UniProtKB/Swiss-Prot annotation:
Organism: Gloeobacter violaceus (strain ATCC 29082 / PCC 7421)
Mode of membrane association: Peripheral membrane protein
Domain of life: Bacteria
InterPro entries: PSI_Ycf3_assembly (IPR022818), TPR-like_helical_dom_sf (IPR011990), TPR_rpt (IPR019734)
UniProt name for this protein: Photosystem I assembly protein Ycf3
Length: 171
């Protein structure tokens, strides 16, 4: 049974019904409508914490979705799931795929930076300053790109860039 038919929350169910009605009226191909339905169900499963089900829906959406912009968000959400499960290498791969489809996706860049910053801090604690600096440099590069795309966002990242002497690389 599709996830949209199992929702017990009245507001969510109402939104889903309205979204289905709008989707049916839109002048787009049937395949695009199906891709969106899978994507929507994937987001609902992800929000409920059912990551395995969300991945199934997202993978079905990827099979059908032809639009690069829309595919970028599917890849991004798959990356979020893998990051939440601690599979950072897999998450990085999906964030990279999202950026290949849509280079103007600052949230993917931010998440790439967060993973590299986390890794840098971890190896720094283990007494490996050279490896830490490699990760911090990757984090800085990703945050700089994200801030350039969304200058009013990522304030903590901007502060980190300033306090580590990397902020001038932004300009």
């Amino acid at each position: 049974m599709p996830r949209n038919q199992r929702n017990d929350n009245f507001i969510d169910k109402s939104f889903t019904v309205m979204a289905d009605m709008i989707l049916q009226m839109m002048p787009v191909k049937r395949q695009a409508k199906e891709a969106f339905a899978y994507y929507r169900d994937g987001m609902a499963a992800q929000a409920d914490g059912d990551y395995a089900e969300a991945l199934e829906y997202y993978n079905e959406a990827l099979k059908l979705e032809e639009d690069a912009y829309d595919r970028s968000f599917i890849h991004y959400n798959i990356g979020l799931i893998h990051a939440a499960n601690g599979a950072h290498d897999v998450a990085l791969d999906y964030y990279d795929k999202a950026l290949e489809e849509n280079p103007r996706l600052p949230q993917a860049l931010n998440n790439i930076a967060v993973i590299h910053h986390f890794r840098g801090a971890k190896v720094e604690e283990e007494g490996q300053p050279e490896q830490a600096e490699e990760h911090y440099a990757k984090a800085a590069a990703a945050w700089i790109r994200a801030v350039r795309l969304a200058p009013d966002n990522y304030i903590e990242a901007q502060n980190w860039l300033k306090t580590t002497g990397r902020f001038e690389l932004l300009y």
